[in-house]
């Protein structure tokens, strides 16, 4: 009996000792490891403990150092699998060797398949591929310095199918699909993004402190954990109290304005196309819609466009959907039997903490019926448009909500520390950086920020040639955020544009880096939506960049100006490729110094040259001209394209006389 007890204790001790070996969260069954490069495998153990790796019928041994850290670089391998990896008593299965891509930035890289599904419904419904694996890094911040690992995640090398991809990056989904179709090898897509974050949050302290000491000091301020905790609790409490007061005083709640029998005849009549409510609190809208017997029995979805800000939407007194912030499209499925023959009432309760409540124009507002009701490309065949006329009444007027989240994710270095630093040295094939919207208010330092970001990430991976694809900002008109003007008029006159200035920073930085490329998407945006849906096309352009950067394929990207000269009062721009001929829009010229007043000019493309005709009365004393193209937030009429249809980036260049 004693011998048996001793044996059990001994085995338990062995198990405890072996269990102390651990690997980062990136290492999971189903993972994709990078082909053609040494494969770092690392982790922690007891100091001095032996670590044994078995992989591909070979064994590799090392010993944990005095801090308990260990690392083994497995030899480079060709694409293939599945394989098994054993590290002491830990076992990982279903491992593929292929290409691994890191996608990072803010919300546009994170827009989910669920959001874009109506744009690509048939493709998403029918496509799945176990050779494409998805990994989503969980959001986390760190103010005290770099972390060694990321948080556990539920999307941990899941095979690509509709269910797994539903909450995953649409750009990541389509990039994985596109690259697999090109290479026929396994694809690992790591998405590491956080909506609304500035680039400074993704850069290391070491990269910022020399040139931007105030950014580092700002980050250090938030290292006071007691302050951060107290402020966070105060913000939560203030928000709860604001919400409670609103709920207790909202006439729409107290008088049940969701009830179809509610008399709204005395309410104000508004047209959603030219209405906004500049108040905080709640405002209610109602409209009646007559449904015939045939439609009353069909599966139905309500498309309520996009709204600012929070809405709770009811049909015939029953809540059918709610959205807690401004960006997501409102797509509410109506429960069977709720939509009835005859008169039906849609009621929308807006809750607004600040700003102006309004409908986003140019979005679909309708009832969709039948089996294709979830598609928006093409639109469903059977629809009933909503009347833009609504009855409106204020439920409660409140002061602006006093809560203000600290938002540590917006503080310099916090995301580099928490979710970027721990990923290295996991072997990658390339990086996608899709960010910039949050820096358009101060675009001047962005080029330097971007250079520092690429530099410190390459330093972290010890790979100075790590390929970066910079996705340029899409076209967008932020004026709709205020609710006015309606309709939004095209931007045609020369203007100072923070969006164009940031695009220029992206362009010049990528051009100056031999291991970077620019994916131009200034034709894939939406005037009224900062999160455009055409993510498959974005992924295709990213893929073209990687075709050139990684695989050394001879592919043409967006046209670029390679030289310029002045001839007989005209400016001749020579491009790196042929473009579509014809009259070209959105070119502007100014004196390169002095007051720099820009003037629209006529332009004509022929072959690989664009000729700008200067105005007859334009004779600046400057020794050079400044030439701009597509220098708008939303350059809708910009039309310089390659023969394959790729748009030219906006730019500003100097042309000497």
Q: Which positions does each model-derived feature cover?
A:
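Short, aromatic- and glycine-rich surface loops/edge beta-strands on solvent-exposed regions
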Residues: 80-89, 347-348, 623-631
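Ser/Thr-rich low-complexity repeats and stalk/linker segments
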Residues: 20, 26-99, 356
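An acidic-aromatic loop/edge-strand motif
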Residues: 90-159, 190-274, 343-426
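Beta-strand-rich ligand-recognition modules
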Residues: 57-80, 306, 313-364
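Aromatic-lined ligand-binding clefts that engage carbohydrates, nucleic acids, or primary amines
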Residues: 42, 267, 289-317, 346-348
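Non-catalytic, glycine-rich low-complexity segments
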Residues: 19-47, 93-103, 110, 121, ...
């Amino acid at each position: 009996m004693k011998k048996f007890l001793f044996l059990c204790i001994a085995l338990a001790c062995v198990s405890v000792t072996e269990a102390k070996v651990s690997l980062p969260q990136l290492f999971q069954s189903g993972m994709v490891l990078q082909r053609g490069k040494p494969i770092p495998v690392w982790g922690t153990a007891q100091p001095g403990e032996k670590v044994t790796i078995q992989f591909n019928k070979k064994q590799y041994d090392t010993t944990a150092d005095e801090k308990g850290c260990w690392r083994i670089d497995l030899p480079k391998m060709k694409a293939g699998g599945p394989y098994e990896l054993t590290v002491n008593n830990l076992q990982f299965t279903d491992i593929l060797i292929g290409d691994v891509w890191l996608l990072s930035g803010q919300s546009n890289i994170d827009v989910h398949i669920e959001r874009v599904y109506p744009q690509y419904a048939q493709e998403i419904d029918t496509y799945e591929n176990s050779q494409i694996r998805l990994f989503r890094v969980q959001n986390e911040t760190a103010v005290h310095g770099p972390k060694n690992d990321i948080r556990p995640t539920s999307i941990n090398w899941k095979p690509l199918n509709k269910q797994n991809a539903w909450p995953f990056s649409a750009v990541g989904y389509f990039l994985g699909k596109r690259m697999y179709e090109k290479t026929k090898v396994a694809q690992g897509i790591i998405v590491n993004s956080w909506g609304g974050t500035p680039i400074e949050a993704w850069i290391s302290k070491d990269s910022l402190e020399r040139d931007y000491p105030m950014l580092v000091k700002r980050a250090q301020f938030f290292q006071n954990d007691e302050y951060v905790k107290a402020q966070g609790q105060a913000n939560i409490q203030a928000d709860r109290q604001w919400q409670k007061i609103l709920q207790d005083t909202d006439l729409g709640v107290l008088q049940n304005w969701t009830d179809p029998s509610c008399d709204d005849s005395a309410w104000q009549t508004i047209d959603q196309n030219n209405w906004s409510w500049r108040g905080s609190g709640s405002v209610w809208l109602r409209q009646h819609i007559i449904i015939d017997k045939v439609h009353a029995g069909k599966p139905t979805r309500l498309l309520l466009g996009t709204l600012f800000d929070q809405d709770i939407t009811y049909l015939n007194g029953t809540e059918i959907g709610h959205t807690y912030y401004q960006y997501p499209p409102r797509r509410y499925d109506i429960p069977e039997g709720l939509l009835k023959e005859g008169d039906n009432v849609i009621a929308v309760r807006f809750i607004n903490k600040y700003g102006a409540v309004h409908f986003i124009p140019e979005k679909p507002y309708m009832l969709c019926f039948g089996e294709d009701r979830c598609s928006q490309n093409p639109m469903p065949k059977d629809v009933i448009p909503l009347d833009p006329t609504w009855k409106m009444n204020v439920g409660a007027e409140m002061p602006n909500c006093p809560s203000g989240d600290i938002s540590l994710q917006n503080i310099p270095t916090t995301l580099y520390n928490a979710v970027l630093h721990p990923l290295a040295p996991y072997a990658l094939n390339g990086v996608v950086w899709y960010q910039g919207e949050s820096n358009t208010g101060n675009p001047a330092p962005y080029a330097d920020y971007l250079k520092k970001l690429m530099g410190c990430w390459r330093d972290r991976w010890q790979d100075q040639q790590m390929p970066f694809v910079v996705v340029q900002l899409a076209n967008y008109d932020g004026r709709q955020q205020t609710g006015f003007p309606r309709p939004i008029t095209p931007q045609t006159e020369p203007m100072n544009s923070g969006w164009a200035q940031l695009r220029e920073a992206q362009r010049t930085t990528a051009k100056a880096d031999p291991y970077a490329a620019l994916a131009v998407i200034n034709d894939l945006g939406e005037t009224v939506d900062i999160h455009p849906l055409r993510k498959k096309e974005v992924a295709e352009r990213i893929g073209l960049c990687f075709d050139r950067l990684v695989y050394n394929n001879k592919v043409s990207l967006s046209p670029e100006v390679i030289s310029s000269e002045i001839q007989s009062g005209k400016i001749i721009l020579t491009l790196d490729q042929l473009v579509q001929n014809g009259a070209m829009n959105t070119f502007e010229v100014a004196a390169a110094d002095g007051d720099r007043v820009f003037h629209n000019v006529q332009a004509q493309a022929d072959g690989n040259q664009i000729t700008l005709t200067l105005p007859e009365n334009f004779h600046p004393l400057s020794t050079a001209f400044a030439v701009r193209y597509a220098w708008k937030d939303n350059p809708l009429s910009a039309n310089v394209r390659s023969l394959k249809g790729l748009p030219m980036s906006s730019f500003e260049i100097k042309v000497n006389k």
